[in-house]
Regions:
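Conserved catalytic network of the ASCE P-loop NTPase/AAA+ motor domain
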Residues: 9-10, 34-35, 59-60, 84-87, ...
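Phosphate-binding/switch region of NTP-binding enzymes
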Residues: 133-208
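Conserved RecA-like P-loop NTPase ATPase core
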Residues: 65, 130, 169
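Conserved P-loop
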Residues: 10-82
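Conserved beta-strand segments of the P-loop GTPase G domain that flank and frequently precede/overlap
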Residues: 18, 42-43, 67-69, 93-95, ...
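Pre-Walker A adenine-sensing motif
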Residues: 1-12
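Conserved nucleotide-binding/hydrolysis micro-motifs of P-loop NTPases
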Residues: 45-48, 71-75, 98-100, 147-150, ...
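P-loop NTPase motor core
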Residues: 84-164
């Protein structure tokens, strides 16, 4: 299983993990980090950080994972530090794209949604900068994205920045919880692996 999980991520484009259940996503990210020497983790939704502070993630080693949890208005000032940290890492995780918008919520008119397109453009530029940097170092970059519902003619499931992710994601995965101790990982698109479903044990998180 170690080799399969390591082979899942590519350095040729984004690796996108889709999810409905935040706990299922946490199961996967806590598992995948255990197979990499050092991880830079941008924790926008702070779930992973909360679990580590509560000692609920078994494989968490302080020196192996560099956590960044930027607040509103802090991201731009942290870019240099983040990029410097990535240089010494073997994996970059951005978790999650949905929570990226919380950093700019004051710039969004919640009634008209004016300002959304500007933030989407900012997010796309942010991802492209990190993607190109990671590609130059041959470091995989994993982004997580919660599926949401949008009503057009009918309700459909769609990820944040759907068009950008479709164009830039070389690997597309979907994780779902089967039980407290087991989760499924669907390989949707991959440059070398056929679509399939992996069954993984959740051995990295303590539930209290």
């Amino acid at each position: 299983m170690h080799k399969i999980l390591c082979d899942l991520l590519t350095t040729s484009g984004l690796n996108t993990l889709l999810f409905y259940n935040p706990y299922a996503k946490l199961c996967f990210t806590s598992t995948i980090t255990s197979y990499f020497r050092k991880t830079t983790y941008l924790d926008f939704d702070t779930t992973y950080t909360a679990y580590t502070k509560s000692d609920l993630i078994k494989n968490y080693v302080l020196n192996d994972i560099s956590l960044f949890t930027p607040n509103e208005g802090e991201l731009e000032s942290l870019i240099t530090k983040i990029v410097s940290n990535i240089s010494n890492s073997s994996l970059l995780i951005i978790d999650s794209l949905n929570s990226f918008y919380n950093l700019y919520y004051k710039k969004i008119d919640m009634e008209s949604l004016k300002g959304i397109s500007t933030i989407q453009h900012t997010l796309s530029n942010f991802l492209m900068i990190l993607l190109k940097f990671c590609q130059s170092l041959k470091i995989p970059i994993l982004v997580t994205n919660m599926m949401r519902y949008r009503k057009k003619k009918e309700w459909i499931k769609t990820p944040t920045n759907k068009r950008f992710l479709q164009n830039k994601s070389t690997v597309m995965l979907f994780v779902e919880l089967q039980s407290q101790n087991i989760f499924f990982l669907d390989i949707i698109t991959h440059p070398t692996l056929l679509p399939t479903t992996l069954t993984l044990d959740n051995n990295n998180i303590n539930i209290r």
